[in-house]
């Protein structure tokens, strides 16, 4: 099997987990929801640790963004039903601890930022390599994690939607929020 894992992520090591499921799988801690609702539906529990598939990496989560989309999923506010049980979190930063079959360009131990479809409110998350990027040296996971949702939304709003060009003036409404803060900084460039 071509799955590669970091040496410190074996079942017997407490750096990743010290528990296994009844069928031998590794268990991790996660915040999960079993039904939609307010913040009272967030449950901290043991869940099976995911295994990366083709084109995916397993990331040890060191920072996770909390975005309005996570709240909307939790409340059931999207037009499509929230698939429960569900682990929110679509913005993470951490360290690659395993790579799936066929993955190239990501080594175990690489610091990364990623936008997985969900699952970021956990100790580990599987993410597609297409949505995962190395973190430059000197930047902490906490500093970089908000770039995925809020930063990219600000870039897309200014560059793609507004087609802002040098020398133009822009009004950013709600500039105190995450996306607005990024948009103001980007507009100055």
Model regions and ranges:
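Residue-level detector of alpha-helix initiation sites
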Residues: 68, 139, 176-179
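A structural motif shared across PLP-dependent enzymes of the aminotransferase-like
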Residues: 116-129
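Cytochrome P450 core scaffold surrounding the K-helix E-X-X-R motif
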Residues: 69-75
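Glycine-rich beta-strand-centered segment in the early N-terminal region that forms part
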Residues: 48-66, 77-119
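Short pre-catalytic strand/loop immediately N-terminal to key active-site residues, enriched for Gly-Thr
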Residues: 84, 139-147
């Amino acid at each position: 099997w071509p799955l590669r894992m970091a040496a410190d992520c074996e079942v017997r090591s407490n750096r990743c987990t010290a528990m296994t499921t009844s069928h031998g799988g590794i268990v991790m801690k996660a915040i999960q929801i079993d039904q939609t609702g307010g913040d009272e539906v967030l449950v901290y529990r043991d869940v099976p640790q995911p295994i990366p598939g083709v084109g995916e990496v397993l990331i040890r989560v060191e920072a996770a963004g909390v975005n309005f989309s996570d709240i909307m999923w939790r409340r059931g506010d999207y037009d499509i039903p929230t698939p429960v049980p569900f682990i929110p979190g679509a913005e993470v930063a951490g360290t690659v601890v395993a790579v799936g079959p066929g993955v190239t360009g990501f080594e175990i131990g690489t610091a990364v930022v990623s936008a997985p479809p969900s699952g970021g409110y956990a100790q580990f998350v599987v993410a597609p390599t297409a949505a995962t990027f190395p973190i430059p040296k000197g930047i902490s996971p906490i500093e970089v994690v908000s770039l995925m949702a809020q930063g990219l939304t600000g870039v897309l709003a200014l560059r793609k939607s507004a087609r802002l060009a040098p020398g133009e003036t822009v009004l950013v409404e709600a500039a105190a929020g995450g996306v607005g803060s990024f948009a103001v900084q980007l507009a100055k460039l």
